[in-house]
């Protein structure tokens, strides 16, 4: 007996078209174009999950540097002083303090002043 792919093909097409929701025009409606766009979008998603980490770290560095320069020091000297003073605050927390709680950031800066 010959095996036909009707059910399997329908299931596979439905799966791809379901994932392609939100794409424009034929990239949403036509299986072949949707499949190509889906492969590309999965590549972008994979790549950008890695880039996101880099971009956030650089954003934190910029914010910490801006707050440090308001108090007459540089980012690199501040981070070195933190390490010497054995204060283990990460960049994410420091950037949040610099943006939302300047008083706390200033107290940390005063705490490491002698190590600058």
From Swiss-Prot:
GO molecular function: rRNA binding; structural constituent of ribosome
Entry keyword annotation includes Ribosomal protein: yes
PROSITE patterns: RIBOSOMAL_L20
InterPro entries assigned: Ribosomal_bL20 (IPR005813), RIBOSOMAL_L20_CS (IPR049946), Ribosomal_protein_bL20_C (IPR035566)
GO biological process: ribosomal large subunit assembly; translation
Gene Ontology annotations for the cellular component aspect, listed alphabetically: ribonucleoprotein complex; ribosome
NCBIfam families assigned: rplT_bact
Name assigned to this protein: Large ribosomal subunit protein bL20
Organism: Helicobacter acinonychis (strain Sheeba)
């Amino acid at each position: 007996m010959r095996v036909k792919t009707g059910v399997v093909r329908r299931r596979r097409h439905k799966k791809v078209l379901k994932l392609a929701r939100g794409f424009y025009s034929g990239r949403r409606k036509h299986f072949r174009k949707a499949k190509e766009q889906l492969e590309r979008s999965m590549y972008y998603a994979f790549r950008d999950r890695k880039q996101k980490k880099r971009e956030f770290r650089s954003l934190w560095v910029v914010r910490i540097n801006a707050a440090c320069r308001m108090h007459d020091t540089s980012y690199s000297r501040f981070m070195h002083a933190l390490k010497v003073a054995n204060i283990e605050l990460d960049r994410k927390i420091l950037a949040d303090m610099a943006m939302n709680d300047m008083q706390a950031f200033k107290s940390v800066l005063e705490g490491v002043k002698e190590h600058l």
